[in-house]
């Protein structure tokens, strides 16, 4: 939830966390959302990058592998 977002940003700012992966099901598809701290050359936190990847290919691969 929103509390998790604020906690993650505080940890990014403090330098205690650099990346958070979040797996979710979106409209029946497996998605991986990665939140990554963006830092300047001095290591100062300047923002968060959100990367969303459709991981459905992985489910399809493993389902075929077990046939």
Name each region found by the language model.
Residues 8-12:
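Conserved mixed alpha/beta catalytic, RNA-binding, or beta-rich assembly cores of soluble enzyme
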Residues 16, 21-31, 46:
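Per-ARNT-Sim (PAS) sensory domains and their PAS-associated C-terminal
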């Amino acid at each position: 939830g929103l509390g998790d977002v604020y906690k993650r940003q505080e940890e990014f700012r403090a330098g205690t966390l650099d990346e958070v992966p979040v797996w979710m099901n979106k409209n029946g598809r497996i998605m991986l959302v990665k939140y990554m701290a963006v830092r300047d050359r001095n290591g100062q936190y300047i923002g968060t990058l959100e990367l969303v990847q459709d991981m459905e290919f992985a489910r399809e691969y493993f389902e075929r592998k077990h046939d």
